[in-house]
Design a protein with these regions (language model features):
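Short, positionally conserved secondary-structure boundary motifs
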Residues: 1-62, 93-94, 101, 105, ...
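Structural motif
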Residues: 69-70, 84
């Protein structure tokens, strides 16, 4: 739970970025050319004051490549559109789902066949906390 807003000023941390693209198919000779540096803060955090991180618990979004234990980079400044993966509170309970808006109706849709979509109806309270911008996945 986020109790209050805080100012986030990422500290630059440039890391080496090699110019070669790595084939995911057949192997090719290694290329030792350093293209420059990359700062993960710059790559992952577009709006520092509106960004927060959450760790995933559960398997309802595995079809979207989001697994138990993954780290989410969530951006509150992004517009939640139909098709966005969002962190939302439904009647005060947090959830991670794909937002679907069609015909004036709203659903939170899991990406796993064992879970049913949740249609937001009547008195149900829905608050979108933010849109998932990136997923950090470890093996």
């Amino acid at each position: 739970m986020i109790a209050h807003a805080c100012t986030f000023a990422p500290i630059p941390c440039p890391l080496p970025l090699f110019g070669a693209r790595i084939p995911a198919g057949f192997p090719s000779p290694a290329d030792d050319d350093l293209e420059g540096t990359i700062d993960l803060n710059e790559q992952l955090i577009r709006h520092p004051a509106a960004t927060f991180f959450l760790r995933v618990q559960g398997d309802s979004m595995t079809g979207a490549g989001i697994r138990d234990g993954d780290l989410l980079v969530v951006d509150r400044s992004r517009e939640a559109k139909s098709g966005s993966i969002v962190v939302a509170a439904v009647d005060g309970e947090l959830t991670l789902k794909r937002l679907k808006i069609a015909g004036g109706r709203v659903w939170l849709v899991p990406e796993h066949p064992d879970y049913a979509p949740l249609e937001i109806q009547g008195e149900m309270g829905l608050v979108v906390w933010g849109v998932v911008a990136h997923v950090v996945h470890s093996f």
